[in-house]
Regions:
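Cysteine-nucleophile protease catalytic domains, especially the papain-like/related folds used
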Residues: 20-96, 100, 111, 161, ...
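TPR alpha-solenoid repeat register
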Residues: 219, 252-253, 286, 320
Length: 331
């Protein structure tokens, strides 16, 4: 019934993207909890299945430390009576789930380009002429990605990372991929240990992750940062140099800046901080690190400019305002 009502509406309205070709679409409500793409996708799926929930309560359960946490999401869903499949699917398998079972599918991708950061989209339909129809938590509902673009963003730790959520009494002919699930949970654990500054435990978890995906740039970057915090500067340098030639992404350049700054290679550190900031001037961590680096080199005016530019975008950010006030009051 979900799909039938939508198809009738589509036929009446005749939107451009349904003009030709095979298509399917399920009627899924749209939510955008800013900064919480996984929580947003889970809320859409739950409401699709008729569950009652408080959105803020859901956010606090799935994102207890301020970011989407997969382990917390699995626990929450299983306690609510849902089965969670973490697996790898191909596009044709997603189409089959939509077309024959009317089940929306959460995919773990990058946001705009491979390996920028883990981002979750909800696939709600497809049009063979134009691509996959998604409820994108950051962009909009009914956001279409052509299949080639979709696949290019779907490479991450492993190609085809997928979360399928269904009521426990509904069984599907798909199997969970324990390798993918374990890797994602190892990384989730790593983030929690980093948050609590438990660097030895963080190192243990990220090493488990890297045994599964030894060349993953996100994992290597995190490993370099943890080694830096543990004072293992030489291995931190070797790790970041292993990943940055192929993936000079802003967050990796930022970590490289921190490593070389600690090694007192000021010239190289400045180059990497500058690259990170130029590519991502709205990233708070990059802004803080670059401003602190500039201030440490007595480039006070440049540091002020970096912080002031960020405050144009986020005028109420107290931490950045305090940093700027500290610089303004310095002699």
């Amino acid at each position: 019934l979900h799909r039938l009502s939508v198809l009738i509406l589509l036929l009446l309205l005749l939107p451009d993207w349904v003009a030709a070709g095979s298509f399917s679409l399920v009627s899924v409500p749209y939510y955008n909890l800013e900064g919480y793409p996984l929580t947003s996708c889970v809320s859409m799926v739950l409401e699709y299945f008729g569950a009652k929930f408080n959105l803020e309560d859901l956010r606090s359960k799935i994102s207890p430390l301020g970011w989407d946490d997969l382990a917390s999401a699995i626990t929450y869903l299983e306690n609510k009576g849902y089965r969670v499949y973490i697996t790898q699917l191909q596009i044709r398998e997603i189409k089959n789930l939509l077309n024959y079972s009317e089940i929306p599918v959460i995919v773990g991708q990058s946001f705009r380009k491979p390996y920028d950061y883990l981002y979750w989209r909800l696939v709600i339909g497809f049009d063979d002429e134009r691509g996959l129809v998604t409820n994108d938590p950051m962009i909009r509902n009914n956001y279409i990605l052509d299949e080639e673009k979709f696949k290019s963003l779907w490479v991450r730790e492993a190609p085809g990372i997928t979360i399928v959520i269904v009521p426990k009494d509904k069984r599907l002919s798909i199997s969970e991929n324990s390798t993918v699930k374990n890797a994602l949970l190892f990384y989730s654990n790593t983030r929690r240990f980093v948050y609590n500054s438990d660097w030895k435990s963080a190192k243990s978890e990220i090493e488990k992750y890297l045994k599964i995906y030894p060349d993953n740039p996100m994992g290597l970057n995190t490993y370099a940062y943890i080694l830096l915090q543990l004072g293992d500067l030489e291995n931190a340098r070797k790790t970041i140099e292993r990943v940055i030639p192929q993936y000079p992404l802003p967050y990796i350049c930022n970590t490289a800046g921190l490593v070389y700054w600690k090694l007192n290679d000021i010239k190289t550190a400045g180059q990497y901080f500058s690259r990170a900031y130029t590519s991502s001037p709205s990233n708070k961590e990059i802004v803080k690190n670059y401003a602190n680096f500039l201030a440490s080199q007595n480039n006070i005016e440049d540091a002020r400019d970096v912080l002031s530019s960020y405050l144009v975008l986020e005028p109420e950010d107290k931490e950045i305002k305090d940093l700027l006030d500290k610089l303004n009051n310095s002699k």
